[in-house]
């Protein structure tokens, strides 16, 4: 779960490397005709580009990743506590089976101070042929957190210089 957020932050500063990191941390989730609500990786990358690197001041959220770190919220300008910590909670549901990957997956809540709900859903899977867990779906992470209040500014080099 944390690797996806780190990859998103790397993508914000260094898009070529960040995109490679995102591909390593997530599954091959190209458009599935049986799941029309699922976005392709190309569409996700386009969304992340607009959100993390975009020039539209009303849409871009360069502080998106910070909003998922403990202690960060809109009122404090998304300044997280140190050491940087990502908080997750397991959803109260059973494992589900994915026949394409011959694996079970589970969903978690990633806590955030950037949304009214206080959390977003992320789905993690361990493919049968891999020793690593991968993020299979993370739509909330690439939907906007609340914008900074008018008096707050964002330090673009907070995490990566």
Locate predicted features:
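Core segments of small alpha/beta cavity-forming domains
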Residues: 1-67
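Short beta-strand edge/turn micro-motifs at domain boundaries
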Residues: 107-109, 114-161
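Detector for Asparagine
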Residues: 29, 34-35, 76, 92-94, ...
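Intrinsic-disorder/low-complexity coil detector
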Residues: 61, 79-82, 126, 138
